[in-house]
Amino acid sequence: MVLIIVAFCLLTASAGPAGAAEQSSPPEVVKITAKRFEYSPNEIRIKAGVPVVFEFTALDRIHGFTVPDLGGIRLTIEPGKENRITILAPKAGTYQFHCDIFCGDGHEGMTGTIIAE
């Protein structure tokens, strides 16, 4: 019994603190502005398989953000509020996004592209 306890203590002590080898840096944050009929930037490059936080600022009114090909990710972007969403592109490719809240004539041109590499 004592031998088992000693062996367990040696194993856990040599392993170090839980997660010490797996410390990861905070996710990348991409800042995006949304205003009538455009996102800036409207082309965003990210790494496939790595979570990225998109942080939106609405400059004029409520806008939407949706990426149909990434499981229908969706966010309402409100002026004066923190608007964040984590994006994970599982594989390399091009993913289109658009505003899904009508914001006037020209709304259909409020689009962009996520390029996962």
Place the predicted regions along the sequence by residue:
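Beta-strand cores of secreted/periplasmic/IMS beta-sandwich domains, seen most often
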Residues: 28-31, 42-61, 80-91, 95, ...
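Bacterial N-terminal signal peptides
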Residues: 2-13
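Short edge-strand/loop segments of extracellular domains
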Residues: 72-73, 116
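Short structured motifs
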Residues: 38-40, 69-72, 82-84
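Short loop/turn segments at connectors of secondary-structure elements within structured domains
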Residues: 26, 40, 61-63, 108-110
